[in-house]
Regions:
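Intrinsically disordered, low-complexity regions
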Residues: 1-15, 19, 92, 106-118
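Short aromatic-glycine-(Arg/Gly/Cys) micro-motifs in beta-strand/loop hairpins
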Residues: 41-71, 92, 99-100
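Generic, low-specificity signal for short hydrophobic/alpha-helical stretches with a mild N-terminal bias
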Residues: 6-9, 18, 64, 68, ...
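Generic hydrophobic secondary-structure signal
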Residues: 24, 28, 36, 54, ...
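Mixed-charge, polar/low-complexity N-terminal
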Residues: 8-9, 14, 56, 76-78
Length: 118
């Protein structure tokens, strides 16, 4: 699926191709890198409610954004839900989550393909 999605984080507008969960999981299992982007800063008063999206980086340098089965962008609203999805559904070896709007964290891989740094 190669529709485009406009992401507005601060003043920057980016357009990424879309990927559904099944293809995303396959890409990650093959060794693709995962990035999590914070769209709206987590609110401590609201039990860490914020907004995050997940991107995957293909080997060709292309970035794809996760969408639901209905081609709607998948935005995670709760920190806990994002952690559970990344750990159990995507089976990431480690999870890094940005907490400030506009920030992102990269370098996450499938737990069986995690580069050994230690």
């Amino acid at each position: 699926m190669f529709l485009s999605y406009s992401l507005e984080a601060g003043m920057k507008v980016r357009s990424f191709p879309l990927v559904q969960e099944a293809e995303l999981r396959a890409l990650i299992a093959e060794g693709a890198e995962v990035e999590i982007v914070c769209l709206h800063e987590a609110d401590k008063e609201a039990r860490n409610r914020g907004e995050w999206i997940i991107l995957v980086h293909r080997a060709e340098g292309e970035r794809l954004v996760l969408v639901s089965s209905r081609s709607k962008h998948r935005i995670f609203l709760r920190f806990e839900g994002l952690c559970a999805y990344a750990a159990h559904t995507l089976e990431l070896g480690e999870i890094h989550i940005p907490m400030r709007e506009g920030e992102s964290c990269r370098g996450m891989y499938h737990r069986d393909r995690q580069p050994r740094t230690r």
